[in-house]
Amino acid sequence: MNETINAGGLPVMPNMQRLKGEGIWFENFFANSFRTDRGEVAILSGFPAQTRMSIMKLPAKSRNLPSLARSLSGAGYATCFSYGGDLNFTNQASYMYATGWQQLTWQKDLRFDTPPADWGYDDAVMCDWFADRVIALSGKGEPFPAGMLTLSSHRPFDVPFSKFDDKELNAFAFSDECVGRMVDKLKASPAWDNLLLVLVADHGYPWPRSLSFT
């Protein structure tokens, strides 16, 4: 993320740059893997990513991992997670349910005027929908963690947005725009007064392309 905020001097992620100054920015915090199925487990269960194995695909193992959702659920929090694509991919839904996420919402549950892309609904519709969901949950007066996985900054990088000729940078800029609008919508709502918002990458991506993961 550090490399793409101003890639080559280009303002690829101006909203993330803005948010850096409004919250706590961890300069040397890096995503734990190169794939979502590994990175999610690292984030939500504190289990280091494996290079050749996806723990998410091993229910007998993953259900016994520590879990942020399970801990919060035990403390009285209502847990929910959302994704604009298919949560059955790489066994995500099974892992989520097994580790304490009580309510999952994904592509099969959603209907928007905008048709889904290759991976699912793009970040524009999902970020707007998610902001509304958080606002509604906040209005109930009960504690909750609500998670969402974005998808537009993923190959094939086809997004309804045109800012940069480079498809990858353009997709990164699109996701940045969507997240920025989501944050602004939350800021303008009563939910913001009692909300902790955490933005984290699920996995790494070398940029520029010549840069190795190491």
Where are these regions (language model features)?
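Solvent-exposed soluble domains appended to multi-pass membrane proteins
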Residues: M1-T214
